[in-house]
Design a protein with these regions (language model features):
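Hydrophobic transmembrane alpha-helices
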Residues: 1-79, 89-165
Length: 165
């Protein structure tokens, strides 16, 4: 049992590392410089939506079964999109991730899809609150923890029968 949990944890860590590497490479691109300088074009925003939307799909595809549930990092793409590019970028990436999650079906399809969209939207609202700038690692980590709590709460509120949530 402990070996299985450790193995699953390592797979999740690999997923997160891939997303971090992509985000790091993105920070070295002209798109990110436009965002930092505060004058990103609609083209730049669409590119960011697509990149972070694909990361959301990647996080879904590579989910790991743990204790009977699929654990994934789908919401991380839209969260980062919102925190870096604002509500339009976060919402766009969230809609891509949610649309893909919707194709998979299952008992948690509505709660998971809704949580993914909200992750991008709330990330964007935090970006606005921080005067259209990245808010820093501390705020991002707190946001991620709170967002995962909201995701769990949505699942408990929406999924029926309750004992399968």
């Amino acid at each position: 049992m402990a070996a299985t949990i450790f193995s699953s944890f390592m797979v999740m860590l690999q997923l997160i590392c891939v997303i971090i590497v992509v985000a790091y490479l993105l920070t070295r691109s002209k798109f990110f410089l436009e965002v930092l300088e505060g004058h990103s074009t609609i083209k730049t925003q669409i590119v960011l939506i697509l990149i972070f939307g694909i990361l959301s799909i990647y996080g879904t595809i590579n989910g790991v079964e743990m204790l009977g549930a699929i654990v994934n990092v789908r919401d991380l793409g839209p969260m980062l999109a919102g925190l870096i590019g604002g509500p339009f970028v976060g919402l766009g990436a969230g809609l891509i991730g949610a649309a893909y999650r919707g194709t998979l079906g299952g008992i948690t399809v509505v709660s998971c899809s809704l949580a993914t969209v909200l992750a991008g939207l709330f990330g964007g609202l935090i970006w606005l609150w921080c005067k259209k700038k990245f808010c820093g690692i501390k705020v991002a980590v707190i946001f991620a923890i709170l967002m995962e709590g909201l995701h769990c709460l949505l699942t408990l509120l929406i999924v029926r029968p309750f004992d399968q949530a």
